[in-house]
Each structure stands twice: as structure tokens, then as C-alpha cells.
């Protein structure tokens, strides 16, 4: 992006920020809590960008002053050296601010701030794939707890040999989707199963779908499209276990999506959870259809959410995790312990780089 174009866009953002501050001082808006909260939120989002814009303007002024000072001290070698050193530092600071503000101006994914439903399904590999699905669930649970998110299983189909055939986890918190969306795809494991007597390495897979939570307004479900059944729950519930039908079996007839929810203690709670999962699944379908054209035009695999996409291999023998999108290796043990920051940050950086290239092409 041309520097003049960047400055023009930053000025527009600064003007919007000033306009929001004027609105916040308006008594009529102050008496409307919902509108006040919305404007305050928008102002809060713009404030860091405006601060960096002002820093950029100040840095430009300092560079100009230093260059003028350099002209005045051409005969003073010591002063000239000091000014040149200062100019190098100022130019470096300017470049950092240009990159930071350009990234901040990139189009935002409106779903990034949402909580998610994380669906993990055992893939190829039989019982070992189910065990692997359970390992992935624990990895995400540890990661979420470390950040301070609320992580709770809402639907599970356990395997007789351990682990899960399918597991849906609710992850609630700030900007959950912005981090976990990079986990969507096929996760492959290479290791010797506990049941393997010959010590041979087996390859198994599990798929992860990351579905941003949807509001009822965004996904309207016709009650006549639902087939609702009940069953006795095998989960927590004390004396209610196997006596009261608290589990909910929900079928969405137009799509064939089935949700079986047993984790809550009451039938009403399980129904609410099942509807929450169904909305997220239907919302994911809507998003995939809406973005199909864009995805076909982009070769990048980052953030596509395509379940057929192999994104990562976990090799136990070599204690190595390979992220195929990044072409980078990471130590296995920290990753499984929930220390995903390094790999997710790298995915974010890769996506930002791709978006900056697209952004510059659009501008030019």
C-alpha cells in the first residue's frame, strides 16, 4: 500500500474515532444503555489504531526535524553521526508502526470475537483413533483453561476401548474463534498404540471442526423441521441416572444433522445445549456456502475450516509436531500439554501476511 493511501485511511479512522467520542458525550445516547455500550465498544476498538496513527505522525515530524538538523550540522562530524544514528532508529520505528497500522486496517472477520463449539471426531484407525480424539480434547481443554476460557463437554459418544467416537466441546470466552479457527482440519498421529504387541507404529486420524456460536436470529430453525426424542442418560445425575429420560436426541430433518446431548442434568438443559450445537452446525454450513467462491480462489489452507484438510501430524517416536500449513516443526510434549500459542501465533502471522498481500493488490 502506498504510504499516502495508508495515511488517508488512518485519517478516516481517526475522524470516526472523534465522531464516536462526540456521540458518547451526547445526553440522548447516554440515556440509551444499549446504544451507549455499542458506541463505547466501537470506540474501544479504534483507540489503539488512533494512538498508533498519532505516533506515526509524531515520528514523521521527528524524522523531518532530524533531517533539517542534519543539514545544519554538515561540518560537525560528531553531531552528524549522532543524528544519522537517530534517523536509523526513527525509520525503524516508522516501519514498525506502518506494519502495525496496516495489519489493524485489514478486514476483520466478524466471527473472531465469538465463542465456539469444537467438534472432534475419530477418523481412520479404529479404537486408536478414538483414543486420539480424547487426547486432542484434553489438549484443547488445557489450552483453554490456560487462557481463562470456559471449556465444557456438551455432547459425547464414548468408545468401549477408551476415548471418544465423537465429542462436542463448548468453549466460551473472549475472541475464542480468532484462535481456534486454525485448528479445523485433520489431525494425524503416528505412534505405537498401547494394544500393539509388536511395537509397530500406527497412523490414526481425528477431524476437528470449529463452529462459531450462532444467535437464534442468525439461524432460524423451523420447529416442524425437528424430530425430538428422549432417552435415559448415562451421565452425571445421581439417582436420576437410567431412571429419568434426561438425554435429548435431536434430528434436523432437512439436513439430516443429528445431535445427542446427555451432559446436562435436566431434559430442558440438554435440549438447550442440543439446539445450541445444531445452530452452530447450521451456521457453519451457511458460512461454507457463502465462502465457497472465495475459498476456491485462494490456494492458502489457513483458516479454511475444511475437514478434509490435513493440517498437522503428531509423531510420538520423534517427539515432533509438524504443521503442514506452516511447514514448521514443534516439540510434541508442550503441544499436547496445551501450549499451542507458538503454532497458533504463527498461523495468525501467516494469515495476516496473506491478507496484506491481497489488501495491497486490491488497493493497487
Swiss-Prot record:
The keyword Lipid metabolism does not apply. One of its GO terms (molecular function) is translation release factor activity, codon specific. Methylated by PrmC. Methylation increases the termination efficiency of RF1. The modification N5-methylglutamine is found at residue 239. Its main location: cytoplasm. Keywords: Cytoplasm, Methylation, Protein biosynthesis. InterPro entries: PCRF, Pep_chain_release_fac_I, Pep_chain_release_fac_I_sf, Prokaryotic/Mito_RF, RF-1. GO terms for cellular component: cytoplasm. It is found in: Cytoplasm. The keyword DNA-binding does not apply. Signal peptide: none annotated. HAMAP family: Rel_fac_1. Peptide chain release factor 1 directs the termination of translation in response to the peptide chain termination codons UAG and UAA. Belongs to the prokaryotic/mitochondrial release factor family. NCBIfam families: prfA (TIGR00019), PRK00591.1 (NF001859). This is Peptide chain release factor 1.
